[in-house]
Amino acid sequence: MAELWLAQKSIILYNRKVLLIQRSNYASGENDWEIPGGGLRFGEDLLEGLHREIREETGLSVYGEKLLYAMTALVSPQRQIVGLTYLSYADSDEVTLSHEHKDYVWASRKQLVELLNKPMLDDFEKHSILDILDID
């Protein structure tokens, strides 16, 4: 049976840095760096789901959410992901990671390019994300 999954992520800014979190062995992609977010639950409001995922993964509350872009990828013959990527701001840089992640960094532009995987960087390039972010 085919499956469609909606994932929401947010580029979270604090003091002109972007929060990256590193996956633990909890799920596939161990050691990959990513921006916070996750799946939307059935019946959940988009921003409520985004806030829930960010709180669960980082302990942060965010504000000023702006939808930056949407993407889709067929990850297997029976599974398609639709991704929404937002821009948000944090009031604090104090991160409390869940068991899904093992490390974090408030990344500069250089670190962002070095740490993120190619598909995410390709999405960022396609949507000119690095050009619109006010980061060091």
Predicted feature locations:
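Conserved Nudix-box catalytic region and its N-terminal flanking loop in Nudix hydrolases
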Residues: 14-56
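A short coil-to-beta-strand element that immediately follows conserved catalytic motifs
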Residues: 61-69
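Short loop segments at secondary-structure junctions
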Residues: 15-17, 24, 89-94, 109-111
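Active-site-adjacent beta-strand/loop module that shapes the phosphate/pyrophosphate-binding cleft
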Residues: 71-94
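Conserved N-terminal beta-strand and adjoining loop/helix that marks the start
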Residues: 1-19, 70, 87-89
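A generic structural micro-feature
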Residues: 2-4, 32, 76-82, 101
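Structural detector for helix-capping/boundary residues
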Residues: 16, 38, 52, 65, ...
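Nudix hydrolase/Nudix homology domain
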Residues: 31, 99-136
